[in-house]
């Protein structure tokens, strides 16, 4: 069986890891509390930028601490109910066309993201895709802000793809992978048909050097 593995933020959608949390907080907090939270978040941005440059896995772990204390069920239900309002309009039209092409070929569609599962699950349901995503630890009905396991970034994302391929009898030499950043390189290198989508500078350089396909999706 052939599969198409898609990164989400920046590849399928014009989103980043911060946006879903910001949407949720704005919709569920009184205005003064939201502004207070936003101010604290802004204070963390320099540290996040340094961490992201050093190791994106470190950044992801740091950022997900922002979920600490949030009611888990409320967050899951809100993201499911508000998919159309906040997320659907940010899906690239070209990405939808490509997913449809893969479906017509009989390929299995798989979303692979360093984001958390309940945020991306509505997108996976809408596209009819399997989902490989991070999970947040829960305690007494609230998120602790800690990931279960290692972030699905870099080699972690590639390992998840290899495990999925082994379980589902996927022929990786004939399969496809789509990503937008250097951290997606290990996943892209797993398949016979890697595609750099709206690539950042470092991924573009690697894609050109390795002869990978480069596309711009809107």
Question: Where are each of the predicted segments found?
Answer:
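Conserved active-site and cofactor/substrate-binding residues in soluble primary-metabolism enzymes
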Residues: 16, 70, 156
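C-terminal cap/substrate-recognition subdomain and adjoining C-terminal extension
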Residues: 1, 77, 84-218
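Catalytic cores of large soluble enzymes that bind and process phosphate-bearing ligands
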Residues: 13, 67, 153
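Small-residue-rich anion-binding loops in enzyme active sites
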Residues: 47-62, 127
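Metal-dependent phosphoesterase signature
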Residues: 58-94
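Active-site neighborhood of HAD-like aspartate-dependent phosphohydrolases
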Residues: 1-51
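Amphipathic alpha-helical interaction elements
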Residues: 51, 64-67, 195-196
